[in-house]
Amino acid sequence: MRSKVTGAQRWVVKIGSALLTADGKGLDRGAMAVWVEQMVALREAGVELVLVSSGAVAAGMSQLGWTSRPSAMNELQAAASIGQMRLVQAWESSFGEHGKHTAQILLTHDDLSDRKRYLNARSTLRTLVDLGVVPVINENDTVVTDEIRFGDNDTLAALVANLVEADLLVILTDRDGMFDADPRNNPEAQLIYEARADDPALDAVAGGTGGALGRGGMQTKLRAARLAARSGAHTIIIGGRIERVLDRLKAGERLGTLLSPERGMLAARKQWLAGHLQTRGTLVLDDGAVKALRESNKSLLPVGVKTVQGSFRRGEMVVCVGQDGHEIARGLANYSALEAQKIIGQPSDAIESLLGYSAEPELVHRDNLVLV
């Protein structure tokens, strides 16, 4: 299984705040230099590399003399705007010592939710990688709001892995990987070396929250691995304190937790759909519709929907769930929530008489639907 790591040609590497700062007292240039040495070695070994870097808020906090992470959005955004400049300058300086160039990419969820902007971002990233430049990606914290933020850089890294069709997502953290129990409380806890990303048993052991400087705990890392798996990427959750960890991963050493996708890579449009995190409503399906989606790759017809929840417009993302509340799929609605309310439970040939017009016979077409 570790051959999936050694043979991976396109890596997305996410480095958390705790691994880039000196106990919250500003950026640790020495630590960053060590990371750069390893990433340069990967590039010289033929690996295409994209870096998702946390640390902007932590760097800004240090510059402002703050000792604890603020909760107010405006204060977080102020810290991020100050720290982002220092963070990117530090990466550029360190990579420059090895003759490598970096490029700053700041993303918001809107950039990936809009199909045209998604394709533009993908084209830019691919061009940078082809030029041998290392893209340094972060969330654009200065403009996002709670409603449109990714939530953490683990999730952002997974979406970037989808965007660039990466073979491997490496999430570097302050833990050695995922354990079968909390190692802070249980000395008998064992590292989980390999598992399927969709294994439900992992949910029980992924408890806990992020550290003082970051937002992402182990649950968000597991969620990120599952998101990356939708585009066929493997994910390694691994301790960033392990000496020369990237070098050793490339050499095939059995470190960290390797989470593998169940299925192969989704088609490009399906990858974009899978990356949608902002959903606007929910469709509750009957058992027949659930079976049709899961087993026959069918479109979702109005007759198979029992309930419409939320408020959404035509073309917005909705979640499809069974009557037990379990998510089955997500897709783009052909009708608004108000229109859907009028046609659910009815055959498609009744749509025109119910609405006065018929846009599509499906509530969600299979080309705009992705199973989860």
Swiss-Prot record:
It catalyses: L-glutamate + ATP = L-glutamyl 5-phosphate + ADP. One of its GO terms (biological process) is L-proline biosynthetic process. It is found in: Cytoplasm. Its EC number is 2.7.2.11. Substrate binds at residues 54, 141, 153. Keywords: Amino-acid biosynthesis, ATP-binding, Cytoplasm, Kinase, Nucleotide-binding, Proline biosynthesis, Transferase. Residues 280-358 form the PUA domain. Pathway: Amino-acid biosynthesis; L-proline biosynthesis; L-glutamate 5-semialdehyde from L-glutamate: step 1/2. One of its GO terms (cellular component) is cytosol. The keyword Transmembrane helix does not apply. InterPro entries: AceGlu_kinase-like_sf, Asp/Glu/Uridylate_kinase, G5K_ProB, Glu/AcGlu_kinase, Glu_5kinase, Glu_5kinase/COase_Synthase, Glutamate_5-kinase_CS, PUA. GO terms for molecular function: ATP binding; glutamate 5-kinase activity; RNA binding. The keyword ATP-binding applies. It is an enzyme of class 2 (transferase). Coiled coil: none annotated. ATP binds at residues 14, 173-174. HAMAP family: ProB. Catalyzes the transfer of a phosphate group to glutamate to form L-glutamate 5-phosphate. Belongs to the glutamate 5-kinase family. This is Glutamate 5-kinase. The gene is proB.
